[in-house]
Amino acid sequence: MGARVTRALRNFNVEKRAEREISKRKPSMAPKHPSTRDLLQEHRSQYPEIEEVVSKKDNKLLSLLRDVYVDSKDPVPALPVKVEPRQEPKEFRLPIGNHFDKNITDIPKGKITVVEALTLLNNHKLSPETWTAEKIAQEYYLELKDVNSLLKYFVTFEVKILPPEDRKAIQSK
C-alpha cells in the first residue's frame, strides 16, 4: 500500500513540473576578466568576419556528418582469459621476545621508539620527582608539550596479583 501512495505522489503533476524545469533560465557564463574582455573586443573589431563564420552553418560539413555511420562491436578475444583465484597474503608475525626492535637503528631527534616510551613512562611512574617532564624532554630531545601529553594520557599497565587469602574471602554465589 505504501508504494502505491508514494508512486502517486511522485507522478503527481509530472508534466507541469517538467515544463517548469525546462522553462527555467539557463545559467549564464562566468564573467570574463576585464583584461580578457578588452582583448576580445579589440579582436572582434579588427576581424568582424570571424563572428559570421563561426555562427554560419557549413552545409558541406553537415552532409559529411550525416554520412558517418558508427558500428562498434567488441573484439572476440583470441585466447580465453583465465581467472585465477586470488592468493591470500601469507601470515606475518613478529618474532617472540623483546628483540624485535633490533632493526631500528636510526631514530631522528624528537621521536622515540615504543620501548623508550614505555621506559620513560615507567621511570616517571616509579619516581616522578626525579623523572619530571622537563628532564624527560631534555633526555629524549622531545618537546615539553608532547611529554606533558604523553604523561597525562598514557599509562603503563599495572598487574596486581591477589594473594591466596584474599581469594578465600570472596564467596561464590
Curated annotation (Swiss-Prot):
<dbReference type="Pfam" id="PF06784">
    <property type="entry name" value="UPF0240"/>
</dbReference>
<feature type="modified residue" description="Phosphoserine">
    <location>
        <position position="35"/>
    </location>
</feature>
<dbReference type="GO" id="GO:0051607">
    <property type="term" value="P:defense response to virus"/>
</dbReference>
<keyword id="KW-0597">Phosphoprotein</keyword>
<dbReference type="GO" id="GO:0032981">
    <property type="term" value="P:mitochondrial respiratory chain complex I assembly"/>
</dbReference>
<keyword id="KW-0496">Mitochondrion</keyword>
<feature type="lipid moiety-binding region" description="N-myristoyl glycine">
    <location>
        <position position="2"/>
    </location>
</feature>
<keyword id="KW-0449">Lipoprotein</keyword>
<comment type="subunit">
    <text>Binds calmodulin. Interacts with NDUFAF3.</text>
</comment>
<dbReference type="InterPro" id="IPR009622">
    <property type="entry name" value="NDUFAF4"/>
</dbReference>
<keyword id="KW-0519">Myristate</keyword>
<dbReference type="GO" id="GO:0010257">
    <property type="term" value="P:NADH dehydrogenase complex assembly"/>
</dbReference>
<comment type="similarity">
    <text>Belongs to the NDUFAF4 family.</text>
</comment>
<dbReference type="GO" id="GO:0005739">
    <property type="term" value="C:mitochondrion"/>
</dbReference>
<keyword id="KW-0112">Calmodulin-binding</keyword>
<dbReference type="GO" id="GO:0005516">
    <property type="term" value="F:calmodulin binding"/>
</dbReference>
<comment type="function">
    <text>May be involved in cell proliferation and survival of hormone-dependent tumor cells. Involved in the assembly of mitochondrial NADH:ubiquinone oxidoreductase complex (complex I).</text>
</comment>
<dbReference type="GO" id="GO:0031966">
    <property type="term" value="C:mitochondrial membrane"/>
</dbReference>
<keyword id="KW-0472">Membrane</keyword>
<protein>
    <recommendedName>
        <fullName>NADH dehydrogenase [ubiquinone] 1 alpha subcomplex assembly factor 4</fullName>
    </recommendedName>
</protein>
<feature type="region of interest" description="Disordered">
    <location>
        <begin position="16"/>
        <end position="40"/>
    </location>
</feature>
<dbReference type="GO" id="GO:0005829">
    <property type="term" value="C:cytosol"/>
</dbReference>
